[in-house]
Amino acid sequence: ARGANGVIIVTTKSGSEGKTQVNFNASLGYKKVSKLVKTMSPYDYAYYQYELGSTDYGNYNDLDIWKSIEGRDYQDEVFGRTGNQKQYNVNVSGGTKDLKYNIGFSHNDEKSIMQGSGYAKNNVNAKINANLNKWLSLDFNGRMAFTKLDGLNGGADTNESSAANSVVANTVRWNPVEPLSGTSDDDEENSTSTRRNPTERITDTYKYQERFQQNYNVGLNWKPFKNITFRSEFGYGWKYNNTDQVWGSNATTNSKYGYNGQPQVQFVRLENKNWRNANTLTYDNKKLFHGRDHINVLVGQEWSSSQDVTRTNTSVAFPTSFTLNEVLANTAAGTALPNEGNIKAEENILSYFGRINYTLNDKYLATFTLR
């Protein structure tokens, strides 16, 4: 890999010679918010509004009524549930002197503390090392990962015209009780006449993500002479990130797309393809000057290519009576905005590199790198 300090070699877990071994691990955990941010009581909030000159919560003589009113704790409503996490892992390894393998599968499943949020992830890893003869060896490693995410995952709501109006921020900022008049003279960001409380917004928002990634690498090592090794490796990767999101009428009161109060839907498709080829020649002599010194010289070249593709489809102005499922099932019932697409130019890199390590008497080390 490219690095500021030269060539960096990254290795993964390999198999070992011996009988086939199967290992299985499982764990279960629970999570819950340990401490919430302290917010105003209904009385404190009503009194604060009165001091600001608002009469939406009654006259001064009526403010004591709010002492007996139980306000809503939006932090508890949004983050109050008990989450859990389950993990499973199975690994198979073994091999002979000339063939070693290591294959693993893991599954993570989480119900998050945030209402409507969670994820599931599956990973498959494989690594194989084979000695074809005394001059040639082959190694292969592959990895596949598939992830499903539900919910806003931290409160991000890309439909909002202002990031400050996120669900997370408003669990702390939102008024604990509604004004007597049903409307409020608060600032626009917290105005109940144009906004919806965090619980309404999160229950009227649907977000589902799928992420898939696969990477494969194969390498061939050839040792034609003593102390000299030639290695050629090739890697290929492909991944996508798909997001489906629907905002119901309670989640579009401050939409950046306009059409406030009308359901909206957006589909985002991200894709990346990449490949890499590297060829290196290494000279390694541990018995230089009758074993006093050790020299390692590596030269090589690498080229790689990567390309990103993004597509976004958005539809707005669905009937206000539509539920989230009805929007997903009838996307043609809305008004389609112009499609957004971006096919980036391929990013191609060709490079040459070299490294020299010289050890003197196992005490002094000199290193030279160039790329």
Model feature map: region roles:
Residues 1-25, 85-87, 100, 106-108:
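A beta-strand signature from Gram-negative outer-membrane beta-barrel systems
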Residues 17, 85, 96-97, 133, ...:
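Outer-membrane beta-barrel channels and translocator barrels
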Residues 1-6, 30, 71-83:
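Periplasmic N-terminal accessory/gating domains of Gram-negative outer-membrane beta-barrel systems
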Residues 98-101, 135-138, 227-230, 289, ...:
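Repeated loop/turn-to-beta-strand initiation elements of outer-membrane beta-barrel proteins
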